[in-house]
Amino acid sequence: MKLGKVELCHFLQLIALFLCFSGMSQAELPRSRSKPYFQSGRSRTKRSWVWNQFFVLEEYMGSDPLYVGKLHSDVDKGDGSIKYILSGEGASSIFIIDENTGDIHATKRLDREEQAYYTLRAQALDRLTNKPVEPESEFVIKIQDINDNEPKFLDGPYTAGVPEMSPVGTSVVQVTATDADDPTYGNSARVVYSILQGQPYFSVEPKTGVIKTALPNMDREAKDQYLLVIQAKDMVGQNGGLSGTTSVTVTLTDVNDNPPRFPRRSYQYNVPESLPVASVVARIKAADADIGVNAEMEYKIVDGDGLGIFKISADKDTQEGIITIQKELDFEAKTSYTLRIEAANRDADPRFLSLGPFSDTTTVKIIVEDVDEPPVFSSPLYPMEVSEATQVGHIIGTVAAHDPDSSNSPVRYSIDRNTDLERYFNIDANSGVITTAKSLDRETNAVHNITVLAMESQNPSQVGRGYVAITILDINDNAPEFAMDYETTVCENAQPGQVIQKISAVDKDEPSNGHQFYFSLTTDMTNNHNFSLKDNKDNTASILTRRNGFRRQEQSVYYLPIFIVDSGSPSLSSTNTLTIRVCDCDADGIAQTCNAEAYVLPAGLSTGALIAILACVLTLLVLILLIVTMRRRKKEPLIFDEERDIRENIVRYDDEGGGEEDTEAFDMAALRNLNAIRDSKTRRDVTPEIQFLSRPTFKNIPDNVIFREFIWERLKEADVDPGAPPYDSLQTYAFEGNGSVAESLSSLDSISSNSDQNYDYLSDWGPRFKRLAEMYGNGQESLYS
């Protein structure tokens, strides 16, 4: 705990000592009677012992132990036969007792804020027997408070807000300080508040700590934040009291007390007449000293000749007024516009209307600049009609365009061929007259939508576009025909007058009054005895049987020509043939079998199925023939077949581990071939002139001579060979010797050459060389057998 001033502490200590000594009078000591005490079966007279009511001053800093009080028993005659002991809270550690006199002292500095009192127990013992002479009694040592704690603001520093323009006495915030001293003892914990910084704008209530405004109409736009320092002092603010301070930041919140104002009374902007609709012309902004919702604006055009041409709206983020175009501008029609624009706060505060008006106006002049515009057509769409029977070169209609600029340049016309790929139409470049360029067919394309281009003669880059919709009028140029391919059947047991088919017709033409078709049989079929036709007068006709009993064996198919006439002018007609098949039907008249050949084919297979089966058989035969041919080719001998190679065999293994074994054997006798040593190596960069040379037989020579000569010859070849590897590279050489009777296989001539060498001895080498003997011996004819 913090201590007060040194002088105050010394003064309080003297007072406490005076109180303690004055309380030691025996007449003032309270008595405590103990219960009767019995020992050895004999009653003992009841004794009593007394002690002070103890108080200890906190924060004692003296060098000697602080005297607390004195314990005394009635049985104590002062002869030293009684000793006193102390137990309980702080006994021996904080409080000690003189066992002879009963004086209690405090050995440590005490702090009431840590512990306000201590509960202890006193005991008087006979010094000789060490037995109690009085019952144990409990007492309390209370710590007396001193003003050693200053007030503290536990929630500081504070921040608060108050609306600007608030009246005097408006509550801002309440601050609270706490004092750890004893509130029930003196004025150590009684706090009062005062303001050290922030006057004359704010004040604080001394007892409650409520901060209030002290000046009226504080303006946020002038100063929006204040820093206050508040003091809390104990001892009711008297001299010698302890104090603590905290800071309070007060922010003035905004109210709508400032009207909007345009920084300029007039504005002027230039825009080209080609500016598209909805484009931004300009942005203007009225200034408002307020912030947030109090600065939100609404703009509107209140007057001027641009009403309906322009509009203005507010940008919610920037609070600017955005002027945009509503209709196209035309320099030739009007060169300038004047707008009267008003800006007003969206939400006005009724308390401050006297500071208004909360709106302002300005003038905006918009100058329209002339630009070179493309030609303009007199109509956005030209509908035209033409008959499909119209001849080439017929005039369909005319389009017209003009230059809207003051120069009024001549206009030339053309057709955008991307909209007329077939080039059905032409247009006169000067007059805009559209004519047909090809014969038209409504059934192919009933409507042609083409784009006409109009460009200035003096500036071809200025192009206007007009749209023409040409509708092709229909003429009766298509004959009627069956509406579908009919599959008509008649049962063998059909009765006369039975309807076997109902037919209808279609026509690609589209007459204005709709189609009307007339059906009849052709002249040569009018008197046939099998079928008749009935026109139903509703663009349909019915086919009926004339006799009963049809037999597939006699005739399985009937062809009935039908004559159809339309109602066009002139009318067109066509003859369509209806195919009627005779079928075997069940009791319900449902056809079961309609083909006479079904009685002939045993398995009921159609012609298509037979063709498919035949194709499969042929495919199998071709595959079998191909396999046989490939096998026969594989039996032909190959000169370089691995089984017929008489070189030394190379045995390869794929085993891993155990070191490396070189199994590629070679015949050392081959090194004895002197010819291999003496012959120069074939140059890689020179084309050989002779493809084959027979090798003569050489006699045997010593091995050391063979190796020396072989290495010497190969060294000279490597020195003069332009294609040889680098100098420090590894050279590998091998040649065939004369140890074999047949010499090297490389000396064998091709079977196609005219060699007369005799290889009959190959037959004596055994079964492994049988094939080689057949190839080069007398039996080589078998190679081609």
Curated annotation (Swiss-Prot):
Q: Mind telling me which InterPro entries this protein's record contains? A: Cadherin, Cadherin-like_dom, Cadherin-like_sf, Cadherin_CS, Cadherin_Y-type_LIR, Catenin-bd_sf
Coiled coil (residue ranges): none
Task: Outline the extent of the Cadherin domain.
Answer: 49-153, 154-262, 263-377, 378-482, 482-599
Q: Which residues form the propeptide?
A: 28-47
Q: Residue ranges, Extracellular compartment? A: 28-607
Q: Where in the cell is it found?
A: Cell membrane
Segments spanning the bilayer are 608-628
Q: Name one GO biological process term.
A: homophilic cell adhesion via plasma membrane adhesion molecules
Per the entry, what this protein does is: Cadherins are calcium-dependent cell adhesion proteins. They preferentially interact with themselves in a homophilic manner in connecting cells; cadherins may thus contribute to the sorting of heterogeneous cell types.
Q: Note what the entry says on domains.
A: Three calcium ions are usually bound at the interface of each cadherin domain and rigidify the connections, imparting a strong curvature to the full-length ectodomain.
Q: What is this protein called?
A: Cadherin-7
What is the protein's species of origin? Mus musculus (Mouse)
The lineage, from the top, is: Eukaryota, Metazoa, Chordata, Craniata, Vertebrata
